[in-house]
Amino acid sequence: MKKVIITPSKLKGSVKIPPSKSMAHRAIICASLSKGESVISNIDFSEDIIATMEGMKSLGANIKVEKDKLIINGENILKDSNYKVIDCNESGSTLRFLVPISLIKDNRVNFIGRGNLGKRPLKTYYEIFEEQEVKYSYEEENLDLNIEGSLKGGEFKVKGNISSQFISGLLFTLPLLKEDSKIIITTELESKGYIDLTLDMIEKFGVTIKNNNYREFLIKGNQSYKPMNYKVEGDYSQAAFYFSAGALGSEINCLDLDLSSYQGDKECIEILEGMGARLIENQEESLSIIHGDLNGTIIDASQCPDIIPVLTVVAALSKGETRIINGERLRIKECDRLNAICTELNKLGADIKELKDGLIIKGVKELIGGEVYSHKDHRIAMSLAIASTRCKEEVIIKEPDCVKKSYPGFWEDFKSLGGILKGE
């Protein structure tokens, strides 16, 4: 579709939240590094997950698809040193997780991708390559990274405020090296929730890492991943769209969510409650957010950057002023998300000012409607769809198919809840 045309309406009903993309990436990787057969169930085959599957297959994992399950055997992982090409598509997780994994043994690998992926930072790895004499070459702006060599265990100093994905990539890799290792975090660590997901998944697959208060991680070498069966839980970063719609007056029951989850994006519940919405636990793994008298607040984007676009929609329709702070990393996602959500919501009638590392949002009673652009970013497209539920006139979203990156069934689910739309 080139565009979707949405007639404003409240959403109502129950929706099965897609499985967590973050946890699926991690489970596929750990299973692929295990010597034996694992079954990973409840998989949503988004573009990012397919990229990780294909990447691990390129490195030697045997992966079979059976409906929503993956049967994975890592017996032959990294057995040969033949030249390999790994297409990351637009998945930053695939790229940053698999780069160090590909260097567990001597290897030659070409990482390619598309979209904005070539513009996303990789300097953390380049510094490690130079220290360890791993050969590498890359093209500015485009993702065409060639690496040759292998990693050795030891001490790794990593900034914590660029992307937690670098740390996760090393956490997956270092237990399989001969030497013991230490990761030292040299700045304040952002997105701790994603590190928790990585550590939890690694532990489930039988690997031990000591976490010293997120300042350093101590990793014994010569460990091995153990195969297991694992079901992926529902994704709070996707539930955040429906929670936000609920806060704005829709009535949506979200299924397949674990309230004890380690997912950092679960923070959306606390933020929305702080703004005046109310959480309802309907039954086991079933949650709703109910509309309340919404007021502006301060939202720290450093620990939950992925849910900031849709929370900006809620803030735009809340009383008073909301400030998004510590959000500079949103500029290096699939698009510049601070600029994109500010620009597009203002087209719909919001009052948002863009800052270097955040936003100032002055609430309005309602949005008007109009034509907006997704910036080919899945989270911007879905956020604008939620904004349409509080518009007076129809909303036209250009380039809506980008939702396939993380949530291929979004538009069907939106319609099943009473959303009125047509694609062109």
Curated annotation (Swiss-Prot):
Where along the sequence do coiled-coil regions lie?
A: none
Biological process, per Gene Ontology: amino acid biosynthetic process; aromatic amino acid family biosynthetic process; chorismate biosynthetic process
CDD domains the UniProt entry points to: EPSP_synthase
The question of whether Plastid is a record keyword is answered with no
**Uppermost EC category:** transferase
Question: What's its catalytic activity?
Answer: 3-phosphoshikimate + phosphoenolpyruvate = 5-O-(1-carboxyvinyl)-3-phosphoshikimate + phosphate
Q: Name any one GO molecular function.
A: 3-phosphoshikimate 1-carboxyvinyltransferase activity
What are the positions of the active site? 306
**Which key words are in the record?**
Amino-acid biosynthesis, Aromatic amino acid biosynthesis, Cytoplasm, Transferase
The subcellular localization recorded is: Cytoplasm
Using the UniProt record, give the first listed, main subcellular location.
cytoplasm
For whether the record's keyword set contains Amino-acid biosynthesis, the answer is yes
Gene3D superfamilies, alphabetized:
Enolpyruvate transferase domain (3.65.10.10)
Specify which residues bind phosphoenolpyruvate according to the UniProt entry for this protein.
21, 92, 120, 165, 337, 379, 405
The record's GO CC annotations read: cytoplasm
Q: Hey, which pathway is this one from?
A: Metabolic intermediate biosynthesis; chorismate biosynthesis; chorismate from D-erythrose 4-phosphate and phosphoenolpyruvate: step 6/7
Assigned EC number: 2.5.1.19
Which residues does 3-phosphoshikimate bind?
21-22, 26, 163-165, 191, 306, 333
Domain of life the protein comes from: Bacteria
Give the family this protein belongs to, as stated in its UniProt record: Belongs to the EPSP synthase family.
Q: How does it assemble?
A: Monomer.
Q: Which NCBIfam families did the record assign?
A: aroA
What PANTHER family does UniProt report for this protein, alphabetically?
A: AROM/DEHYDROQUINATE SYNTHASE, PENTAFUNCTIONAL AROM POLYPEPTIDE
Q: What does this protein do?
A: Catalyzes the transfer of the enolpyruvyl moiety of phosphoenolpyruvate (PEP) to the 5-hydroxyl of shikimate-3-phosphate (S3P) to produce enolpyruvyl shikimate-3-phosphate and inorganic phosphate.
Protein name in the entry: 3-phosphoshikimate 1-carboxyvinyltransferase
Q: Which gene encodes it?
A: aroA
